[in-house]
A protein has these predicted regions:
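C-terminal coupling/interaction segments
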Residues: 2, 239-309
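ABC transporter nucleotide-binding domains
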Residues: 3-193, 197-200, 204-206
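Non-catalytic surface loops within mature trypsin-like serine protease
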Residues: 17, 34, 230, 254-256, ...
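A generic structural signal for secondary-structure junctions
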Residues: 108, 224, 231, 278-279
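Short, surface-exposed beta-strand/loop "edge" segments at domain boundaries and coil↔beta transitions
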Residues: 153-154, 232-235, 255-260
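ABC transporter nucleotide-binding domain
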Residues: 168-252
Length: 309
């Protein structure tokens, strides 16, 4: 799959009354190329779930535009999207077998029974959903999502209630899905160490805005960890710094060559970089070329503020 999976221009979502409502997203502009595995990270309340709901066509923007799989109305391409929300709303009275049957009936022409059965694997087919553990419900929800053979898969904290072995197994399945079918995956998570090995794209949301966006490798390589006794960090942009005795350690966004005579230079891990940006909300945003959109080029008619739910 080639092209752009998701593109946002000035995207905003406000809940409540116009004057005193809560802004979940504000002026978000970014692009996600198709076929990527994107980590959507940020603190609680940052706007991650709101962004996923908008992309799934379950909510409408209050401002700006959002294009998903080429459509400015994500609900119109819902048959090409799979969404696993945090609460995994399955029918509790149905059995596992009934649930898989319903998935096939609701997705005629797209359903991949072999994949759904493989993901549901160890689940007892006669067990009712209400008797399943949290991790088992997650497995069943992912079986429905992957069985649909979506072009875009949206996952909201999908691995939180899985044990480490199941988490590793299902993460491998997601990676294989992308490699084989070019599926675009957007996955929100707080498990930063797992995202580093699984995701090749990154969107950091904080305060309802996109703080970082682009290829994970490009974002990491744009930064450096500097350690030394020197105090002048110019011309680099300081994200975070700390002093221990006479030694200064700083995470910087590089603005030209680093003076290796004055500084010991190492590349930060993705986890170190994300944590530093989360601790430093005033650090300027960074979108790499693959994530940037042309200022003012709005796809479709720009939405004005509308009455919010």
């Amino acid at each position: 799959m080639t092209g752009v999976a998701i593109e946002a221009h000035g995207l905003g979502r406000t809940y409540g009354r116009r004057s005193g409502g809560r802004r979940a997203l504000h002026d978000c502009s970014f692009r996600l190329p198709a076929g990527r595995v994107c980590a959507l990270v940020g603190p609680n309340g940052a706007g991650k779930s709101t962004l996923l709901n908008l992309a799934a066509g379950l909510d409408r923007p209050s401002a700006g535009s959002l294009t998903v799989l080429g459509s400015t109305a994500p609900g119109d391409v819902r048959d090409r999207i799979a969404f696993v929300s945090q609460d995994k709303p399955l029918y509790p009275q149905l059995t596992v077998a009934d649930t898989l049957w319903a998935g096939a009936e609701l997705n005629p022409g797209r359903w991949d029974r072999a994949t759904a059965d493989r993901i549901a694997g160890p689940l007892e087919r006669g067990a009712r959903v209400r008797t399943l553990s949290g991790g088992q419900r997650t497995r069943l929800a992912l079986a429905l999502a992957l069985g649909k053979r979506p072009e875009l898969m949206l996952l909201d904290e999908p691995m939180a209630d899985l044990d480490p072995l199941a988490r590793h197994e299902l993460m491998g399945v997601l990676m294989a899905e992308t490699a084989e079918h070019g599926t675009t995956i957007v996955m929100s998570s707080h498990i930063l160490t797992e995202l580093e090995g699984a995701c090749d794209y990154l969107l950091l949301v904080d305060g309802g805005r996109i703080r970082l966006g682009g290829e994970a490798e490009d974002i990491v390589s744009a930064h450096a960890l500097l350690t030394g006794r020197a105090q002048d960090l110019s011309p680099h942009t300081v994200v975070e710094s700390r002093t221990t005795g006479r030694q200064l350690t700083a995470l910087v966004r590089k603005e030209g060559p680093v003076d290796t005579a004055a500084w010991s230079v190492t590349e930060p891990s993705l986890e170190e970089l994300l944590l530093a940006h989360l601790r430093s909300p005033d650090a300027p945003p960074l979108l790499t070329p693959s994530a940037s959109v042309v200022a003012g080029a709005v796809v479709g008619a720009a939405r004005e503020e509308v009455a919010s739910a």
